Amino acid sequence: MRKIWHQRDILLQAGGGSQFVVAGKFRIHKAYKYLHHSGVQVPWKRLVCNSRASPKSTFVMWLAIQNRLATKDRLIKWNILVVSTCGLCNQQDEDISHLFFSYKYSTEVWEMVLQNLGVQRSVLQWQEEVSWAVKKSRSSRKSDVSCAMAFIESVYGIRLQRNSQIFSSKVESPLVVANRILFCVACRQ
């Protein structure tokens, strides 16, 4: 009830609501826009929201972009006792930027995917790859849509392999993972 009265007070402060009347009719849309504080626009919105990638992959991407995946560095921050080293390379501490494209396995997977899509460039760091995928997601060209979708599916595929290594000590070769990613992209076009 307090929230309703608070919103009423805000409307009264705005001039009694007369600014929301057009041609003698109260426009709820105008009042809503006035009362509703719009959130900050994020640059990755089109990458996640307009993706043709599978819903599971898109959700994992959404978590990864916001650095909300349960990587070992985050588990340690939550006071969960885990070994901080990466489950795939067993050399460096696992965080989002390490997991995605800072070690050999993920780099090989992403390189193979890029080569099969006809993209001739080296693998970049996590934030640079996200920026590249965001740029591709803004385009309507089929090749760019495929690249953005492949990026999302690659993040998901690498995440699955990381989980498979941790929970069942099994990891597929980068070629198998890359081919599965490309198959998913081809099926969803």
Question: Can you say where each PLM-predicted feature lies in the sequence?
Answer:
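A helix-boundary/hinge signal
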Residues: 1-189
